[in-house]
Amino acid sequence: MRPDLSLHTLNPSQSPLMRKIESQMIAAVNNSVNWKSANTRVEFIEENNTSKVYLHDNHIATVGDDFMEIFDGGWQSVTTKSRLNSLINAFCNGVTDGIFQKDFQWYIRDNNVTQDFVNGYIFA
């Protein structure tokens, strides 16, 4: 079972309304179960207690007990960014961490420090 998320706060610049599919995705990661709906899939890997998240069969995140590794899956789309930010809000600090886009370029914000987006970035 993943940590209690009730103490996490959301980034005020993001909508507090989460897509139903994203809520279900987070529940699957939180409950360490396999899950699939439409274009999104969670695969729980029991050997190392991680969950891999896929969008259109492209790996976009790995969530472990104390880290989250993110990828764009080859597509820097609005949907990919939405899935990643939902995961960040659930398993990182949604106030200081996130993915955003400016002038068609993706950026990572980690502890309020901004850098260019890189695949394989780890929030720990």
Regions inferred by a protein language model and the residue ranges of each:
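Terminal leader/tail segments of proteins
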Residues: R2-A124
